[in-house]
Design a protein with these regions (language model features):
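A bilobed periplasmic-binding-protein/Venus flytrap-type ligand-binding module shared by bacterial periplasmic
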Residues: 124-129, 244, 252-265, 284-287
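Ligand-binding pocket segment of bilobal, Venus flytrap-like solute-binding proteins
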Residues: 168, 173-242
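Early extracytoplasmic/lumenal segment of secretory-pathway proteins
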Residues: 21-85, 338
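Short beta-strand->loop
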Residues: 26-29, 113, 125-128, 132-133, ...
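Periplasmic solute-binding protein
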Residues: 80-91, 108-135, 167, 252-257
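An extracytoplasmic/periplasmic, membrane-proximal ligand-sensing/linker region
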Residues: 291-338
């Protein structure tokens, strides 16, 4: 009898013992500055932050396979397309508190995940070979014009940033119009797509192309000197241009996160997500990653500010990037975009 009584006491203790005051992040972001930010959150809240880093494919595979046994509370990554596609697999829970809803524009979140920083995908052109007047009032749609034949460089069609960019064009112009546009756009490539965004800027600097499509933070990273003198000098040979200023504005994407379906610490995950949207956290993020803030009243880094202010496309829902991702890739491959 005493034995069974001891067992009952132990079971009661195990079921009522307080959970550890922690939150577990699975993140594909690769910034040491993010770790500094999590440490700041711990100092303020007392909640310990555990981080599992890796590439998106590996992290998502682990989360899915572990299911309800997963220790992951919060998934953080770059690109709304990635977040949306993972959401379609049913891996998030409602992550949007009234506080987040009041801070983040509806176009930069869903019910289950939210942006924590923005990035722009823009045109970089050769200062030596392209007159600024030729670039003025340029839209993404204009890049299909034959006058740009053999002048454009961009990375491969399997890149999620390109897929989300094309998805945004589908969202605004429809599938048929985008299909025709992509076919003409691909004909203007100066070379077969290869390399990352910085490789596209380097190609323009080297004279292999006149126009590159790349995210702004890659250019800022090069210009900062963090990638070496050669890349810094290359960045100085190109100039940024923000397209579509006469209509919807420049294509914007996000870094973001959402609370996972089986999160063991959802309350702590929400506290961290809300913290990442405070002025202090937003300022820390954009100063270290060269991204744009999600919230107002926060200035981007000096290098990003030097690129100038511009009209951002905040009307196209970033949810559409996952919604049209499959169609986007279909059109790109059909057009011969390698």
């Amino acid at each position: 009898m005493k034995f069974f009584l001891i067992i009952l006491i132990l079971l009661n203790f195990l079921t009522t013992a307080p959970k550890a005051n922690e939150v577990n992040i699975f993140s594909s972001r690769h910034y040491s500055s993010d770790i500094q930010l999590y440490e700041k959150f711990t100092s303020i809240s007392g909640i310990k932050v555990n981080v599992v880093s890796g590439n998106d494919a590996a992290l998502q595979k682990r989360i899915i396979e572990e299911g309800s046994d997963s220790e992951a509370d919060l998934y953080i990554t770059a690109d709304a397309g990635r977040l949306g596609l993972f959401d379609q697999k049913g891996m998030f829970q409602n992550s949007i508190s009234p506080k987040i809803k009041s801070i983040v524009p509806k176009s930069l979140r869903s019910d289950n995940w939210t942006g924590i920083a923005k990035r722009a995908r823009i045109i970089f052109y050769s200062k030596d070979r392209i007159d600024k007047e030729v670039i003025n009032n340029l839209r993404y749609e204009d890049l299909s014009d034959p006058k740009w034949n053999n002048k454009i460089t961009v990375r491969q069609s399997n890149n999620i940033y390109n897929q989300s960019w094309i998805a945004s064009i589908i969202s605004n112009n429809g599938k048929e119009n985008t299909d025709e546009w992509v076919k003409k756009f691909v004909k203007n490539f100066a070379r077969d797509p290869k390399g990352n965004d910085r490789a596209q800027i380097l190609a323009v600097a080297a004279g292999e192309a006149d126009i590159a499509i790349a995210n702004t933070y890659y250019y800022a990273l090069m210009l900062s000197g963090q990638k070496g003198l050669e890349q810094q000098q290359a960045a100085k040979k190109v100039a940024p241009y923000f397209p579509n200023q006469s209509d919807r504005g420049t294509h914007m994407n996000i870094s973001g996160g959402g609370i996972l379906k089986y999160a063991p610490n959802p309350e702590n995950a929400l506290k961290l997500l809300e913290f990442l949207l405070t002025e202090e956290a937003q300022s820390h993020i954009v100063k270290n990653t060269f991204e744009y803030p999600i919230i107002d009243n926060v200035e981007p880094s000096e290098i990003i500010k030097s690129m100038g202010s511009f009209k951002q496309d905040l009307s196209t829902p970033v949810e559409d990037y996952a919604r049209f991702q499959a169609v986007s890739l279909e059109l790109m491959l059909r057009a011969g975009w390698k």
